[in-house]
């Protein structure tokens, strides 16, 4: 038989439990609201337009700012390009090992790897690594030519469920980043969702997915962007991008030492054509997202 004191204790516990749950939910919502405010202030202070789409792949919690607005892709398209090559390789077994010949006329600004191999050419796989890890522009154009042009990469994006990504031109023209120009753009939300499907989901076969992840983890261009914004011990697999109007981007996956990875896309652009890139803003946005989603 339950005593009056026990009954009162049980009733009090029953009353407190919903309040505890409400406090937890409020705390999480408050943290996210604070992070959203921090991103808005970061954008205001930068003088540009900032787009952010991050989500914790374990909890599903998202943090967004202008996540559904279009931003210039710049070199972040190269992640989708490499994925399209990997998908094609499942139907063309010799593709990755195929050696592509090219001449000095194919070299354009920022082609640090291809310029060293004009005499011998490079394999498709080596070009994928060069365009992801060093943002080699000539390699990107040669890969686009091998696949069939920018429209082929857009078609690949549609095939994995991305209705937003569009690639219209090649390097370096695709980096004009003119405000309001829909060419060569995507939204942070669409890019993050595609990255999740490609790197962590089943849009690619297991071997192709592992290869894409390996290329991304070997990126060398993120020192002042995602890498500058994550805590010590985190791994970053990403693709950066830069263009006119101060366009400064970074997209990819952030792996904590323990726990679920965070998928993140950050895009920044300015109204002035001669604006300088702001890698520091990308790093600051990364810190805000990581603190909110994985803290």
Task: Describe each region flagged by the PLM.
Residues 51-56, 64, 80, 101, ...:
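Soluble periplasmic/extracytoplasmic beta-strand elements of cell-envelope proteins
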Residues 46-49, 144-200:
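Mid-domain, small-residue-enriched loop/turn segments at the edges of structured enzyme/sensor domains
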Residues 25-72, 288-292:
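Beta-lactamase-like hydrolase cores
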Residues 107-143, 150, 184:
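Conserved catalytic neighborhood of penicillin-recognizing serine enzymes
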Residues 91-116:
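Short, glycine/proline-biased beta-turn/loop segments that scaffold the active-site neighborhood
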């Amino acid at each position: 038989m339950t005593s009056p004191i026990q009954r009162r204790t049980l009733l009090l516990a029953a009353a407190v439990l919903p309040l505890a749950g409400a406090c937890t939910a409020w705390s999480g919502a408050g943290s996210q609201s604070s992070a959203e405010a921090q991103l808005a202030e970061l954008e205001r202070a930068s003088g540009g337009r900032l787009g952010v789409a991050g989500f914790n792949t374990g909890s599903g919690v998202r943090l967004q700012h202008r996540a559904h607005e279009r931003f210039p892709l710049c070199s972040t398209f190269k992640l989708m390009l490499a994925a399209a090559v990997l998908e094609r390789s499942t139907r063309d077994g010799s593709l990755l090992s195929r050696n592509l010949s090219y001449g000095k006329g194919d070299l354009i600004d920022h082609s640090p790897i291809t310029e060293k191999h004009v005499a011998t050419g490079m394999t498709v796989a080596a070009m994928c690594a060069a365009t992801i890890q060093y943002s080699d522009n000539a390699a990107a154009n040669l890969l686009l030519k091998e696949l069939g042009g920018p429209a082929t990469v857009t078609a690949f994006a549609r095939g994995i469920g991305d209705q937003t990504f569009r690639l219209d031109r090649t390097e370096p023209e695709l980096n004009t980043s003119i405000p309001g120009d829909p060419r060569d753009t995507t939204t942070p939300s669409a890019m993050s969702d595609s990255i999740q499907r490609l790197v962590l989901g089943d849009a690619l076969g297991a071997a192709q997915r592992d290869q894409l992840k390996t290329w991304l983890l070997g990126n060398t261009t993120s020192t002042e962007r995602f890498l500058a914004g994550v805590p010590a011990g985190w791994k970053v697999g990403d693709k950066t991008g830069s263009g006119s109007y101060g366009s400064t981007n970074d997209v990819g996956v952030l792996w904590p030492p323990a726990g679920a990875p965070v998928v993140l896309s950050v895009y920044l652009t300015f109204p002035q054509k001669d604006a300088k890139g702001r890698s520091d803003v990308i790093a600051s946005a990364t810190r805000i997202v990581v603190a909110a989603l994985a803290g």
